[in-house]
């Protein structure tokens, strides 16, 4: 019984650590990733217009932002519970989870940048408005 309580407490603490990112958080993460990855200015302009070329620069930028938002882990892949919390915003969480799970796959080419980008592009294809609306304006 003590083990069960300890495991439950650990899960509760881990779940409590995730905080939905705000617009300000996203801007900070974008700036940090542009700087740390030396993203060229022409790419930054594309990203601002929600244009994401399918190349390593873009893919690693998406992974960097998702890592900072705690939506993706380089080993575990998409963090489904965190994605649901980030994207739900008053919507039915199970419906959001279903949409997220459609885009979760394995790291087939052993490249975390490609893995994060595949999930992003898959979800973006049918849910761009949900992604844009998910960033809290606090």
UniProtKB/Swiss-Prot annotation:
Q: Which residues are glycosylated?
A: 127
Alphabetically sorted, this entry's keywords are: Behavior, Disulfide bond, Glycoprotein, Secreted, Signal
Induction cue: (Microbial infection) Up-regulated in salivary glands following dengue virus type 2 infection.
Query: What SMART domains does this protein map onto?
Result: PhBP (SM00708)
Q: Where is the signal peptide?
A: 1-16
Q: Name one GO molecular function term.
A: odorant binding
Tell me which Gene Ontology terms the entry assigns under biological process.
sensory perception of smell
Listed binding positions for (9Z)-hexadecenoate are 30, 61
Give a yes or no for keyword Signal in this entry.
yes
What superkingdom does the record give?
Eukaryota
Q: In which tissues is it expressed?
A: High-level expression in female mouth parts, particularly in the proboscis (at protein level). Moderate-level expression in female antenna (at protein level). Expressed in testis but not in the accessory gland or ejaculatory duct (at protein level). Expressed in spermathecae (at protein level). Female salivary gland. Female chemosensory organs: antenna, palp and proboscis. Not detected in midgut.
Sorted alphabetically, which InterPro entries does this protein's record hold? PBP/GOBP, PBP_GOBP_sf
The compartments listed are: Secreted
Disulphide bridges: 33-64, 60-113, 103-122
Can you tell me which residues bind (5Z,8Z,11Z,14Z)-eicosatetraenoate? Answer: 30
Describe the subunit structure: Monomer in solution.
> Main role?
Involved in modulation of blood-feeding behavior and capacity in female mosquitoes. Required for normal oviposition. Required for normal fecundity and fertility of female and male mosquitoes. Required for normal expression of VGA1 gene, which encodes the egg yolk protein vitellogenin-A1. Involved in regulation of spermatozoa development. Required for normal female longevity when mosquitoes are maintained on regular sugar meal. Binds long chain fatty acids. (Microbial infection) Facilitates shedding of dengue virus type 2 particles into mosquito saliva. Does not affect dengue virus type 2 replication or infection prevalence in midgut and salivary glands at 14 days after blood feeding.
PANTHER family found in the cross-reference section? GENERAL ODORANT-BINDING PROTEIN 99A-RELATED, ODORANT BINDING PROTEIN-RELATED
Protein name stated in the entry = Odorant-binding protein 22
């Amino acid at each position: 019984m003590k083990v069960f309580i300890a495991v439950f407490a650990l899960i509760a603490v881990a779940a409590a650590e995730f905080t939905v990112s705000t617009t300000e958080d996203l801007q900070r993460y974008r700036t940090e990733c542009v700087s740390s990855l030396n993203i060229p200015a022409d790419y930054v302009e594309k990203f601002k217009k929600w244009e994401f070329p399918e190349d390593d620069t873009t893919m690693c930028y998406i992974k960097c932002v998702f890592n900072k938002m705690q939506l993706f882990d380089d080993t575990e892949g998409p963090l489904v519970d965190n994605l649901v919390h980030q994207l739900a915003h008053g919507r039915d969480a199970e419906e959001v989870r279903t949409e997220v799970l459609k885009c979760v796959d394995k790291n087939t080419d052993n490249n975390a940048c490609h893995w994060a980008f595949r999930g992003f592009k898959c979800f973006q294809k049918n849910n761009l408005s949900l992604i844009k609306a998910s960033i809290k304006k606090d």
